[in-house]
Swiss-Prot record:
Name of the coding gene: GSDME
Posttranslational mods: Cleavage at Asp-270 by CASP3 (mature and uncleaved precursor forms) or granzyme B (GZMB) relieves autoinhibition and is sufficient to initiate pyroptosis. Palmitoylated.
InterPro entries the UniProt entry points to: Gasdermin_pore, Gasdermin_PUB, GSDME
UniProt-recorded name of the protein: Gasdermin-E
Key words, A-Z: Cell membrane, Cytoplasm, Isopeptide bond, Lipoprotein, Membrane, Necrosis, Palmitate, Transmembrane, Transmembrane beta strand, Ubl conjugation
One Gene Ontology CC term in the entry: cytoplasm
Annotated family: Belongs to the gasdermin family.
Organism of derivation: Equus caballus
Description of its domains: Intramolecular interactions between N- and C-terminal domains may be important for autoinhibition in the absence of activation signal. The intrinsic pyroptosis-inducing activity is carried by the N-terminal domain, that is released upon cleavage by CASP3 or granzyme B (GZMB).
């Protein structure tokens, strides 16, 4: 809930992606200026890097005894005023300029964070650079030794953070919209953040979380490039990446490339940078179509009972964002040969634990004593790799998009949406008279499809007897690709022999 609120807030005020949302309150306490942070390079291009706070600061790992005393500059960052009603509007004034808030979609009230007045604390970089001249990092420090063993992490320092100045309450509301065509409703969770005044009580909230002040809700880091002798450089320019001198790109250890290297786009280092699309954003989908057909074949060749069971468990995962996040974390740890801690499984609610255990069993893992163990055989490896490929895409979908995908499954329009993207012409137009697109002639079904595509930065509109998809030509994101992978995977699971 806290992570969803901070992510939602940054989407409104930080279009360039310079800030990183704090994902939990424990990390908020650890986010001190000059703290060391590890940036974990992910496997797929659409996966956002993961950041983890270390228990030391930059000064703690320098060889010289003289400690660093950073000069801290503090200023106002955001002042937001707005109301949470059925129809909400407002304007945020930030250090990045004014951002207009737009709310729409019948029956769905978008989550909007109102953290009150926020302050920005940042290190004087020029002074820090001067203080760090001729200083070196002790590479024998135990914390750094563990980083060097992993070989796919970058050392960063925290140089800026955004903190609250007032006590806030984050409340979560579960909404079920009207049924679509009398068949199925869309169940979504919305998160509201409001400043508490005079001990106001949040009513009609499923869950409420009180956040004290000051709490860090976002931060930014600078990567370090560390040489063999411990000398280091601050990577201040865009495009300049950190790391350790002995780690070349070809030396970085990625998990079981033999099982995963057949998938498209696997060797892109970071998410969020967009994809090179000289012929338009949708052209990337065309390029990967045949590979995706091949990559999801392990789903198609499963026995019907096995495939149905896996599809059923995945439907339960789609309806719960927290469970999806845990499943993605477990798969990620397994791929990197890290056994998921028993506490992670033990902390889950019994139904969630059952769903996660069932999913792992169905994709080739035995769970013994809380620790998953891969079954022998190439088939099990390919099946798990395929499942990880799909889960990693689903986990990167925007808020409530997974729930919309689940609704599309229940409405049985996933095959039509896959065909729509596959059959589109170069300019994004598709003939609605195509028999495979017949389900989309229904107005309510098409409305659900529009909302799903809109979450992936694709504007879907019906023009007479055709459907047109439009994506931003400027700064295209990876979201259309994530959507297409998600649709293809779900289609393969739901396909009849």
């Amino acid at each position: 809930m806290f992570a969803k609120a901070t992510r939602s807030f940054l989407r409104e005020v930080d279009a360039e992606g310079d800030l990183i949302a704090v994902s939990n309150l424990n990390d908020s306490d650890k986010s001190q200026l000059l703290s060391l942070v590890t940036k974990k390079k992910r496997f797929w291009c659409w996966q956002r890097p993961k950041y983890q706070f270390l228990s030391v600061t930059l000064g703690d790992v320098l060889t010289e005894a003289q400690c660093l005393s950073p000069v801290v500059v503090e200023s106002d960052f955001v002042k937001y005023e707005g109301k949470f009603e059925n129809h909400v509007s407002g304007t945020i004034e930030t250090a990045l300029g004014k951002v207009k808030l737009n709310f729409g979609d019948k029956g769905l009230r978008e989550s909007q964070s109102s953290f009150g007045t926020l302050r920005k604390q940042e290190v004087d970089l020029q002074q820090l650079i001067r203080d760090s001249v001729e200083r070196t990092i002790n590479l024998k420090n135990p914390v750094l030794q563990q980083m060097l063993e992993s070989k796919n992490e970058v050392l960063c320092i925290l140089t800026q953070k955004i903190v609250t100045t007032q006590k806030c309450v984050i409340s979560e509301h579960i909404q079920t919209e009207e049924k679509c065509g009398g068949m199925v409703g869309i169940k979504t969770k919305t998160v509201q953040v409001s400043v508490t005044k005079d001990e106001n009580i949040i009513k009609d909230a499923s869950v409420a979380l009180e956040i004290p002040a000051p709490t860090t809700i976002a931060y930014s880091v600078i990567e370090l490039y560390v040489k063999l002798d411990g000398q280091f450089e601050f990577c201040l320019l865009r495009g300049k990446h950190g790391g350790f001198e002995h780690q070349r790109r070809s030396d970085i250890v990625f998990p079981d490339a033999g099982a995963l290297q057949d998938f498209p786009f696997w060797d892109v280092p970071d998410a969020g940078q967009g994809l090179p699309t000289p012929d338009g954003p949708l052209s990337v989908l065309k390029q990967g179509t045949r590979l995706l057909e091949k990559n999801f074949f392990p789903f198609v060749e499963l026995p019907e009972q096995h495939r149905t069971a896996l599809n059923t468990v995945l439907q339960a995962v789609l309806s719960d964002e927290e469970l999806l996040a845990v499943l993605e974390q477990v798969c990620d740890d397994l791929v990197h040969s890290l056994s998921p801690p028993l506490a992670m499984l033990g902390e889950l609610k019994p139904p969630h634990r059952q769903d996660l255990t069932a999913f792992l069993r169905l994709v080739g893992y035995r769970v013994q004593g809380g620790c998953p163990c891969l079954e022998d055989g190439v088939g099990s490896q390919k099946l798990f790799s395929t499942a990880y490929f799909l889960v990693s895409a689903l986990a990167e979908m925007p808020d409530n998009a997974a729930a919309l995908l689940g609704t599309c499954c229940k409405l049985q329009i996933i095959p039509a949406l896959c065909h729509l993207l596959h059959a589109m012409s170069h300019d994004g137009v598709c003939d609605l008279e195509d028999p495979a697109l017949a389900p989309l002639k229904d107005t309510e079904r098409f409305g659900v499809a529009q909302r799903l595509f809109a979450s992936a930065d694709i504007n879907l509109e019906r023009v007479q007897s055709s459907v047109k998809a439009v994506t931003p030509l400027k700064d295209p994101s990876v979201l259309p690709l994530i959507l297409y992978i998600s649709l293809k995977g779900l289609c393969a699971l739901g396909r009849e022999h």
